Amino acid sequence: MRILVSNDDGYTAPGLEALVQALQGLGELTVVAPETNHSGASNSLTLNRPLTVRTAANGFICVNGTPSDCVHVALTGLMDTRPDLVVSGINNGANMGDDTLYSGTVAAAAEGYLFGIPAIAFSLAEKGWAHIEAAARVARQVVERQVAQQLAAPVLLNVNIPSRPFEAMAGLQVTRLGKRHPSEPVVRTTTPYGDTVYWIGPVGLAADAAPGTDFHAVAQGAVSVTPLRLDLTQHSQLDEVRRWAEPLCASL
């Protein structure tokens, strides 16, 4: 089995190292990760400059681009053989609910999924790398279980792991995405030169953390596994939009 591993925290991140170590023995690993932290990069690709690729001292391949760049370059320019699985993480912090739209960790996995490859994004629910070894142990078990399945189509899984000892994990739940309140306002400050600058504010608290959501599972101490899709079509509104757009359809 061939596994492509990436992340968004950068090629020196403890979460990436822990994940790679945990996956040893499962197959041939290729690690391609960003040169610097690209948290919040979402699915962006770098189109306005060329990308450089080098092998770092730790043996990982690093790219001066986004997480999506890393997976795209790996799949279309670096790997001679298509991988059987793309794995991203382990992220320093949760990627639940609305986070998935912004997450570079999820985006790296999604890039593989766009190429028709099963993919899994792993995140540690609290920042700071506490219990990262336990999270890596969970990640290995999820990967082992996923690759053992004979699924009709590739899956894209978003996995959030509580920051706690392995023995204290309260099981695993298959969940839907919850929802956050809007982010906090930007933080305005002034540079020593008198210029006004703005920092993006903290993420909002959970607005939908009902049973069955990723927020609820992690709050209960359980690992959350959410299958994702990339079709953003709101199918339930197609007929409604067709009705109000009908005059335009006839006149344009």
From Swiss-Prot:
Main localisation: cytoplasm
The protein's required cofactors: a divalent metal cation
Cited Pfam families: SurE
Signal peptide: none
E.C. designation(s): 3.1.3.5
Catalytic activity as recorded in UniProt: a ribonucleoside 5'-phosphate + H2O = a ribonucleoside + phosphate
Annotated a divalent metal cation binding sites: D8, D9, S39, N91
Stated role: Nucleotidase that shows phosphatase activity on nucleoside 5'-monophosphates.
Protein's recorded name: 5'-nucleotidase SurE
Organism: Bordetella petrii (strain ATCC BAA-461 / DSM 12804 / CCUG 43448)
Gene name of the record: surE
